[in-house]
């Protein structure tokens, strides 16, 4: 706080991975983020590398700490989706992903390989039959990736915010490197994973509608996108199971979307 001459400007938020505090640097509002786990630092490096293009700007960084732009707008993608405008929310997420994946002039920073990110799924699939189809699909996709680029890794309604005149921008990347199709898979399980009490992603017809929008926006092959959705939902369910919450709402949402995607693929 002293080094960057910051003043506290709100309540401290604690997550499993970070401490996040609204601050001011002179007249400038900002967010101070301090990592609680080493994995966060790849995301810090990626956010810095994006340099405000499609993502929040980074004003300063140090070991385990990041001073970043604060969202100033009143828009909320989850509320937009719940209000009957899910198609519009989906398009905003697609546009944000496209900006993040656009070529940059310099080489990317050191990031987590997507193959390593999927290890929890591969470990647990041998013990949990419900995860086996996703693990099989993930292995096939990871063995022959396409359009490899830096990935956000957690691109959903809560991580794309309204920055006023700067538009919708991403925050909180995991910092991965892999096939860009993966970054779109998270759209298909949210905002339900953030608020299971307000189902949307699992409603009849929603997966098909979102699939149509993403394919039209990106040019992806529908079958390959469905396979990445299957892989992603398996990984997400594996995380819940690994945390001892395999019977909870989060894993149930993942497995429901997984089953819908497999039916469409068949």
Swiss-Prot record:
The active site is at 154 (proton acceptor). The aminoglycoside phosphotransferases achieve inactivation of their antibiotic substrates by phosphorylation. InterPro entries: Kinase-like_dom_sf, NH2Glyco/OHUrea_AB-resist_kin. GO terms for biological process: response to antibiotic; secondary metabolic process. One of its GO terms (molecular function) is streptomycin 3''-kinase activity. It is an enzyme of class 2 (transferase). Belongs to the aminoglycoside phosphotransferase family. The keyword Disulfide bond does not apply. It catalyses: streptomycin + ATP = streptomycin 3''-phosphate + ADP + H(+). This is Streptomycin 3''-kinase. NCBIfam families: APH_6 (NF012171), APH_6_Ic (NF000011), APH_6_Ic_gen (NF033614). It comes from Klebsiella pneumoniae.
């Amino acid at each position: 706080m002293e080094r960057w001459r910051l003043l506290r400007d709100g309540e401290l938020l604690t997550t499993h991975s970070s401490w996040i505090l609204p601050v001011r640097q002179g007249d400038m509002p900002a967010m101070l983020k301090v990592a609680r786990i080493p994995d966060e630092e790849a995301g810090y490096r990626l956010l810095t590398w994006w340099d405000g293009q499609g993502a929040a700007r980074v004003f300063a960084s140090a070991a385990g700490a990041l001073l970043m732009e604060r969202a100033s707008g009143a828009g909320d993608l989850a509320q937009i989706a719940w209000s009957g405008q899910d198609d519009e929310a989906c398009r905003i997420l697609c546009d944000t992903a496209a900006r993040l994946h656009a070529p940059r002039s310099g080489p990317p920073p050191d990031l987590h390989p997507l193959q390593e990110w999927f290890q929890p799924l591969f470990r647990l699939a041998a013990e949990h039959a419900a995860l086996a189809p996703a693990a099989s699909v993930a292995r096939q996709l990871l063995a022959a990736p396409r359009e490899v680029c830096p990935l956000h890794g957690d691109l959903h309604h809560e991580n794309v915010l309204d920055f006023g005149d700067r538009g919708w921008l991403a925050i909180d990347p995991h910092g991965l490197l892999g096939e860009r199709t993966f970054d779109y898979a998270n759209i298909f399980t949210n905002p339900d994973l953030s608020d299971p009490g307000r189902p949307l992603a699992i409603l009849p017809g929603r997966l098909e509608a979102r699939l149509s929008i993403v394919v039209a926006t990106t040019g992806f092959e529908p079958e390959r996108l469905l396979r990445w959705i299957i892989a992603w939902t398996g990984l997400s369910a594996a995380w819940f199971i690994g945390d001892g919450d395999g019977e909870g709402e989060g894993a149930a949402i993942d497995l429901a979307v997984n089953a819908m995607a497999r039916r469409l693929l068949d």
